[in-house]
């Protein structure tokens, strides 16, 4: 008799994706982030569900309802901070996951990679809309600034902004629609994640040296299930340390002031995970140019398969490319730092140089270096 795990129409899908999946024997901890992202998504949907039970999407009561959750709802404070800091953990895992893909050449799985880029955009959109909901000062002004960027689009820009905001300014209509869209997007992300997984399972995982692992496969369970559980425990440990010891470390003090359309904060900045893109946006003095650079800074990921000139897939045996990769990481950290600084003398020029460096590294230096490495190896 066949095992029910392998014959049942639903169970065999789970079996082929998480139990009997043939996995390379040599994948490192950098391959843990996919499962961690899944855990983050489930955690965000669950905490979000409980928050939505007590939250009111109305300009008059939104701020008070969040305060009420923290003060009066049983364990409301921990649910709220797990949701807020869960987003930070989500983005840390996302950046690590994308960085792994860049380093080990995983972008040669085109469908998986492209769905991944769409997932990144969807997650950023969700985080942005969720950011507005507590209706604090920085939430309000951050959203006002970012939505107004759309007015830079020629011909339709101004109408588009008014259409998204549901009026001339951020108001009750905006808050309601952002809440609705923030509630539905995570489920679209979950559906996309399943597609991402289906395509990844179709080709099999990549591995550190970037070579075929068909000759040496091991079952996903128990080897990688136990490894993923360890990763999950470390993720939850990090999240709970943040939630219980420094819940506001990554937030902005301005958000403890209710939104006031008549009072602009001195330095408007988004959450830390958008700062690198915000720095690129600010470093270009032209509005439309800035918006284009902002979108391209993430959309450039789609070009990665086209920019791959090396005869080797992974960077494991390419020391010069490795140097450039880590320079790119340092550059992104610099941009993140600059995005949180005021627009004044030393920061402006540093931001502009870091932005130029970002595009130069990806579009010019890395492909050229790959060619040089091919020649050095006489390939």
Curated annotation (Swiss-Prot):
Heme b b562 binds at residues 83, 182. It comes from the Eukaryota. It is a multi-pass membrane protein. GO terms for biological process: mitochondrial electron transport, ubiquinol to cytochrome c. InterPro entries: Cyt_b/b6_C, Cyt_b/b6_C_sf, Cyt_b/b6_N, Cytb/b6-like_sf, Cytochrome_b, Cytochrome_b_C_euk/bac, Cytochrome_b_N_euk/bac, Di-haem_cyt_TM. CDD domains: cytochrome_b_C (cd00290), Cytochrome_b_N (cd00284). The chain crosses the membrane at residues 33-53, 77-98, 113-133, 178-198, 226-246, 288-308, 320-340, 347-367. One of its GO terms (cellular component) is respiratory chain complex III. Its cofactor is heme b. Gene3D superfamilies: Cytochrome Bc1 Complex, Chain C. Heme b b566 binds at residues 97, 196. Keywords: Electron transport, Heme, Iron, Membrane, Metal-binding, Mitochondrion, Mitochondrion inner membrane, Respiratory chain, Transmembrane, Transmembrane helix, Transport, Ubiquinone. Binds 2 heme b groups non-covalently. One of its GO terms (molecular function) is metal ion binding. It is found in: Mitochondrion inner membrane. Belongs to the cytochrome b family. The cytochrome bc1 complex contains 11 subunits: 3 respiratory subunits (MT-CYB, CYC1 and UQCRFS1), 2 core proteins (UQCRC1 and UQCRC2) and 6 low-molecular weight proteins (UQCRH/QCR6, UQCRB/QCR7, UQCRQ/QCR8, UQCR10/QCR9, UQCR11/QCR10 and a cleavage product of UQCRFS1). This cytochrome bc1 complex then forms a dimer. Heme 1 (or BL or b562) is low-potential and absorbs at about 562 nm, and heme 2 (or BH or b566) is high-potential and absorbs at about 566 nm. PANTHER family: CYTOCHROME B (PTHR19271:SF16). Component of the ubiquinol-cytochrome c reductase complex (complex III or cytochrome b-c1 complex) that is part of the mitochondrial respiratory chain. The b-c1 complex mediates electron transfer from ubiquinol to cytochrome c. Contributes to the generation of a proton gradient across the mitochondrial membrane that is then used for ATP synthesis. This is Cytochrome b. The gene is MT-CYB.
């Amino acid at each position: 008799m066949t095992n029910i795990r392998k014959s049942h129409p639903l169970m065999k899908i789970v079996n082929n994706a998480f139990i009997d999946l043939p996995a390379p024997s040599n994948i490192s901890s950098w391959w843990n982030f996919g499962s961690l992202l899944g855990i983050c998504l489930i955690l965000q949907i669950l905490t979000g569900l409980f928050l939505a039970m007590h939250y009111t999407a109305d300009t008059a009561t939104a701020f008070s309802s969040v305060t009420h959750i923290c003060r009066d709802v049983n364990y409301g404070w921990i649910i709220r901070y797990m949701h807020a800091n869960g987003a930070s953990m989500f983005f840390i895992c996302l950046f690590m996951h994308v960085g792994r893909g860049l380093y080990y050449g995983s972008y040669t799985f085109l469908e998986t990679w492209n769905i991944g880029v769409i997932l990144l955009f969807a997650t950023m959109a969700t985080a942005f809309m969720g950011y507005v909901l507590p209706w604090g000062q920085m939430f309000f002004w951050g959203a006002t600034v970012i939505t107004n960027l759309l007015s830079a689009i020629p011909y339709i820009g101004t109408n588009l902004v008014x259409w998204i905001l549901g009026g001339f300014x951020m108001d009750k209509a905006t808050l309601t629609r952002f809440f609705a869209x923030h509630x539905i997007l995570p489920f679209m992300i979950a559906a996309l994640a399943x597609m991402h997984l289906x395509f990844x399972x179709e080709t099999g995982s990549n591995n550190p040296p970037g070579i075929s692992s068909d000759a040496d496969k091991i079952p996903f369970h128990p080897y990688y299930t136990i490894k993923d559980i360890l990763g999950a425990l470390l993720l939850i440990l990090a999240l709970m340390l943040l939630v219980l010891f420094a819940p506001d470390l990554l937030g902005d003090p301005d958000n403890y002031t209710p939104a006031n359309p008549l009072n602009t904060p001195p330095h408007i900045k988004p959450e830390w995970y958008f700062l690198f893109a915000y720095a690129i946006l600010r470093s270009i003095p032209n509005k439309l140019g800035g918006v284009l650079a902002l979108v391209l800074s993430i959309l450039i990921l789609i070009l990665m398969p086209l920019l791959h000139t090396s005869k080797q897939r992974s960077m494991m045996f390419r020391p010069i490319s490795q140097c450039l990769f880590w320079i790119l990481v340092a550059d992104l950290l610099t941009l993140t730092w600059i995005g949180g600084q005021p627009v004044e003398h030393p920061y402006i020029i540093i931001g502009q140089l870091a932005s130029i460096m970002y595009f130069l590294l990806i579009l010019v230096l890395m492909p050229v270096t790959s060619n040089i490495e091919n020649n050095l190896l006489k390939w």
